């Protein structure tokens, strides 16, 4: 993965509320446990008319050639609701999305996204409405998402967003749970040594 400082990419508008994880990736494609190869199943039942992926749905937004290389997904509230499948995040990343913008996300989906370095940006509904109007009038427009400055630049407008300081720091430095554990390994070692010493003293005292 990469250190996320800022990203400039084409925005695909998916103007649907309450998109659940089964819509993001149907359950029949969850057999694998590695993170690669799920992009082709993203929004499967919306992208394809037949189950064998031989006939695409021409009315689905991601099948529009303008959004072929879209890396930012703009959507409506409660994105990622439903079951806790991490494969939903894997499919979005494998497809090429690096940022999802919405007014709200499911808690479990939000945490899964953070753990996999997919940036979720939460904006007020008025800003989401503005962005949908913008992408409708300027089809194929790109947004700049700056994690350093915590803002989205869309057209002539800069929209600030909030993000947890710890999550921001991890994304900026590409830290995962292993990296964080290694950074405090000396504290863990010191704690373990103290516990061992305490237990030894207690054992000697009671014997």
Curated annotation (Swiss-Prot):
Name of the protein in its database record: 3-isopropylmalate dehydratase small subunit
Gene Ontology biological-process annotations: L-leucine biosynthetic process
EC nos: 4.2.1.33
Record key words, sorted: Amino-acid biosynthesis, Branched-chain amino acid biosynthesis, Leucine biosynthesis, Lyase, Plasmid
Cystine connections: none
Catalytic reactions on record: (2R,3S)-3-isopropylmalate = (2S)-2-isopropylmalate
PANTHER family, per database record: 3-ISOPROPYLMALATE DEHYDRATASE SMALL SUBUNIT, 3-ISOPROPYLMALATE DEHYDRATASE SMALL SUBUNIT 2-RELATED-RELATED
